[in-house]
């Protein structure tokens, strides 16, 4: 299970921490207004028409893989959240509110882990939790 702890909501973005099996993997940023509601989701690798490769798409509750389109939320590389649409989440190393670096590197690493799980036919769960910076463990 992947958990994203949202720590800070600012006008520059929603800053979070992505954790797998209790270990911090990377930071996340989302658009300050167009982000997914906190809750449980699944992740599936899907070919999207406007992308050159399969992307880790975030499936909403009850959504089937064949219902995914170009406007589906996904995990992706990037630098800042202002161009994000549809609830997409950028991965990377946080340097300021709404800004990450080394995004492609963190994205590729996470995708490799997710692909291995997918090949084993494991269901990839995503839980998004809204926590303030005072609530999240110092370890993250």
Give the ranges of each region predicted by the language model.
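Cell wall/extracellular polymer interaction/catalysis modules
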Residues: 1-125, 129-136, 140
């Amino acid at each position: 299970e992947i958990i994203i702890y949202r720590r800070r909501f600012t006008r520059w973005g929603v800053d979070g921490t992505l954790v797998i099996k209790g270990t911090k993997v990377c930071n996340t940023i989302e658009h300050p207004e167009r982000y997914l509601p906190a809750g449980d989701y699944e992740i599936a690798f899907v070919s999207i028409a406007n992308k050159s490769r399969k992307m880790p798409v975030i499936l909403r509750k009850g959504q089937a893989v064949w219902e995914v389109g170009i406007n589906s939320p996904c995990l992706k590389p990037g630098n800042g959240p202002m161009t994000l649409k549809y609830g997409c989440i950028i991965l990377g190393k946080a340097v300021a509110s709404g800004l990450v670096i080394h995004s492609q590197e963190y994205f590729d690493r996470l995708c490799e882990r997710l692909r291995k799980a997918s090949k084993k036919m494991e269901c990839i769960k995503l839980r998004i939790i809204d926590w303030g910076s005072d609530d999240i463990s110092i370890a993250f």
